[in-house]
């Protein structure tokens, strides 16, 4: 899968999407990034820390996969953003952030259809 193209497609999906990035198992964002003209709320270092935390949570979720199936996505809503993570493969995680008023159900469904 072309992760750069996927991130571009995601950013073009909805103007309420702030960030679409793919990180590797080290937490480094390898593809994608912030929507042009939208200010970052986190520094690059904080983004990496956030990615590492997300990777850790997905590791915990995957430990239950044999019993309940693989996770498709996880979402958290904060005061300033919504944050959605999608496991892409064993080594890559997709992080998408949106504005709080974004239609996250529509965005999640569109991303799941593209990432399959």
Predicted regions and their residues:
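Non-catalytic interaction/Regulatory regions outside core domains
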Residues: 1-116
